[in-house]
């Protein structure tokens, strides 16, 4: 390497990386610079030197891109929750198209150069879109603050006015910090592994109902806290306590108890309603979820004789879009509370052809096939880690005729397509901007078994 840590260098940014950073070359050394944009001439300082690349901190933009904008967020550079707010929104969508192309080029699934990559579907107003927050709590000089850890650290950045967060959820977390202070509730101490560590606030867009999870390493007395909070915000319908005594970075423990209110809140998507319990997964951008699920519906050509598997089904929200027009829908999820919601939702909507089971897809699907169930189509919506190897082998073994892959990580998507394109053709990839101002995107991939 020709560069050293703390060295200051000029750099021409040639392109943007998958995490939103600018990329340039200094005497043949690849340099990643967060905050820099394609086409810019910058001055930066090397912060880390690796075997094949270096990382740097942006010091000055000597020649700015015409697509650079001033972020409206006061903590944008320290928070780390958003990565590309300094890029004009239409160009953010172009960037997300390019991220998909970069991932495909890296992993090279069969026929990737001919894949149809459709332009990312963006938002008209890409602000205050997050209906869910998970903020950490810490004490600053005796005052409780809520926020996010700065990128790659355990240093909390207090946030009281997040520009991508739904305003009601932000107002509620602000009130929560005041009440935690007022009632002297214990705040998490990393050395003692004790106290309240995380607060989750989620709003259902359709009903304005709100649920809250207090994550604590020990039992806390919340009666007065709950009384004052629910009086100030009658939209709050559920307060739950999750016990997490782990030293790991996992947000939640295994046990969640409803302390006050109803078991679930009411949400709607694609003209049907469903219950959502506190631990159940649901997309955090309700407006774009309508768009995303609409694309899933378009991608599957199914009828009254077809059977569908909805892997990673959550509360059943994707599968319900098909339950009224197919022979059967079966789904599974590793979170038991989500499956309970899915079962209740199916019953309330009269879908007696929908069946849900708690467990891993790679374990349950082979069991169903041994029992004689045959799926004509499968929908997968895995976490950022992508498909489990065992599930990939299961899909390749049983070979449903159609498949829709909903991905929140283009790298693991491209990796999984290497295996899937052994028997499937990719018809197209349609990305949906679920997370404006971040480097993340969501993609719907239509696959058809090769004849």
Curated annotation (Swiss-Prot):
Keyword line: 4Fe-4S, Iron, Iron-sulfur, Metal-binding, Methyltransferase, S-adenosyl-L-methionine, Transferase
Annotated S-adenosyl-L-methionine binding sites: 283, 312, 333, 381
Keyword 4Fe-4S: yes
An MF annotation (GO) of this entry: rRNA (uridine-C5-)-methyltransferase activity
Record-listed [4Fe-4S] cluster binding positions: 73, 79, 82, 162
SUPFAM superfamilies, A to Z: Nucleic acid-binding proteins (SSF50249), S-adenosyl-L-methionine-dependent methyltransferases (SSF53335)
Chain ranges of the TRAM domain: 2-60
Pfam families xrefs: TRAM (PF01938), tRNA_U5-meth_tr (PF05958)
Active-site residues annotated for this sequence: 408
Gene3D superfamilies found in the cross-reference section: 2.40.50.1070, Nucleic acid-binding proteins, Vaccinia Virus protein VP39
Domain of life assignment: Bacteria
EC number: 2.1.1.-
GO biological process, one term: rRNA base methylation
Family of the protein in this entry: Belongs to the class I-like SAM-binding methyltransferase superfamily. RNA M5U methyltransferase family.
NCBIfam families (alphabetical): rumA
PANTHER family, alphabetized: PTHR11061:SF45, RNA M5U METHYLTRANSFERASE
UniProt name for this protein: Uncharacterized RNA methyltransferase M6_Spy1337
């Amino acid at each position: 390497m020709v560069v050293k840590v703390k060295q200051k260098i000029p750099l021409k940014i040639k392109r943007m990386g998958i995490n939103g950073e600018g990329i340039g070359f200094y005497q043949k050394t690849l340099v990643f610079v967060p905050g820099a944009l394609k086409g810019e001439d910058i001055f930066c300082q090397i912060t880390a030197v690796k075997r094949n690349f270096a990382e740097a901190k942006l010091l000055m933009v000597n020649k700015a891109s015409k697509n650079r904008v001033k972020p409206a967020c006061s903590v944008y550079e320290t928070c780390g929750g958003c990565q590309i707010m300094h890029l004009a929104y239409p160009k953010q969508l172009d960037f997300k198209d390019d991220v998909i192309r970069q991932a495909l080029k890296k992993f090279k699934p069969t026929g990737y150069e001919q894949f149809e990559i459709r332009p990312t579907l963006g938002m008209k107003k890409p602000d205050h879109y997050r209906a869910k927050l998970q903020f950490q709590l810490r004490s600053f000089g005796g005052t409780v603050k809520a926020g996010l850890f700065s990128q790659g650290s355990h240093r909390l950045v207090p946030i009281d006015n997040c520009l991508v967060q739904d305003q009601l959820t932000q107002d509620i977390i602000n009130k929560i910090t005041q009440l935690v202070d007022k009632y002297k509730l214990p705040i998490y101490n990393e050395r003692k592994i004790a106290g309240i560590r995380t607060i989750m606030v989620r709003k259902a867009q359709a009903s304005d109902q709100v649920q809250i999870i207090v994550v604590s390493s020990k039992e806390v007395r919340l009666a007065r806290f709950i009384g004052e909070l629910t009086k100030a915000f009658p939209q709050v319908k559920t307060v739950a306590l999750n016990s997490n005594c782990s030293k790991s970075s996992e947000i939640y423990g295994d046990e969640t108890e409803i302390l006050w209110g109803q078991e679930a809140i009411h949400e709607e998507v694609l003209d049907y309603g469903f219950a959502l319990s506190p631990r159940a997964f649901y997309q955090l951008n309700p407006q774009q979820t309508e768009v995303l699920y609409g694309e899933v519906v378009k991608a599957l050509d199914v009828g009254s004789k077809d059977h569908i598997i909805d892997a990673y089904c959550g509360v059943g929200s994707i599968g319900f879009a098909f339950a009224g027009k197919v022979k059967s829908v079966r789904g599974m999820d590793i979170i038991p509370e989500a499956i309970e919601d899915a079962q209740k939702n199916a019953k309330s909507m009269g879908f007696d052809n929908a069946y849900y089971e708690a467990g891993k897809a790679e374990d349950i699907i082979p069991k169903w096939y041994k029992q004689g169930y045959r799926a004509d189509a499968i929908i997968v919506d895995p976490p950022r880690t992508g498909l489990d190897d065992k599930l990939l082998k299961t899909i390749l073994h049983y070979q449903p005729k159609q498949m829709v892959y909903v991905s929140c990580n283009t790298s693991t998507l491209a990796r999984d397509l290497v295996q899937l394109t052994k028997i499937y053709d990719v018809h197209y990839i349609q990305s949906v901007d679920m997370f404006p101002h971040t480097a993340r995107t969501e993609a719907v991939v239509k696959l058809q078994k090769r004849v």
